[in-house]
Amino acid sequence: MFKKRSAASKTRKRVKVETPVQKPAVQKPAVAVKPVLDKSHVAKLEEEIASRPELDQKAVGEADATAVRLKRLKEQATKHDRLNSEPVASSKKIQQAANLRNTILTDFQPDVCKDFKQTGYCGYGDSCKFLHSRDDFKAGWTLATDWKIDEQKEETRKEAVPFKCVLCKESYERPVKTNCGHYFCQKCFVNRIKIDKSCFICGENTEGIAKMATDLVPMDNANKDK
């Protein structure tokens, strides 16, 4: 039933094992660390380079090895000093002047309901997604020039108004303004219309009517203060 094993099966085969050969470790060349020059050393190098004008020439091949070395050391020292002195721009927030801290919002497409602005009625009613406003919006350049126009009008008006009453040749006392736009003292105007109701300046018939010159009262007070 059972097969007898042969004697040859009990023998073991010899296997040749090759040992790996260890390669000699390759030594990497040591990296020379360049010394950091201080400011005093840089100053000495600058004096030495300034005394030798050939260092500033581009023909490095004509210069000697000492000159080239000093020039490179100077560039390295200047670069190292600049990197250490300048702060990193991305690490800190740039501080701006107080008068420049403005928040400007420009709406190039105002979502205003066109139908409601033109007619005052919108078929969508409260469900309209646009703004129901009938205000008049001015452009930015128009707002910037409005104050200049008002200032010019004020200067023109001040130049047109005499700084003293033309009847009494004195400062205005309770000034009045006629329908033709001329200014007089109240007392002078009353005395004038008793004789002649025409304007003393243009000759137009005033019909004895004049109103208080409220726009001239601040000017009159300023002249009195002076």
From Swiss-Prot:
Could you provide one GO biological process annotation from this protein's UniProt record? snoRNA splicing
According to the UniProt entry, which residue ranges have a biased composition of type Basic residues? 1-15
Cystine bridges = none
Q: Show the GO MF annotations.
A: DNA binding; zinc ion binding
> CDD domains, from UniProt?
RING-HC_RNF113A_B (cd16539)
Gene Ontology annotations for the cellular component aspect, listed alphabetically: Prp19 complex; U2-type spliceosomal complex
Location in the cell reads:
Nucleus
Its protein name is Pre-mRNA-splicing factor CWC24
What is the originating organism of this protein? Candida glabrata (strain ATCC 2001 / BCRC 20586 / JCM 3761 / NBRC 0622 / NRRL Y-65 / CBS 138) (Yeast)
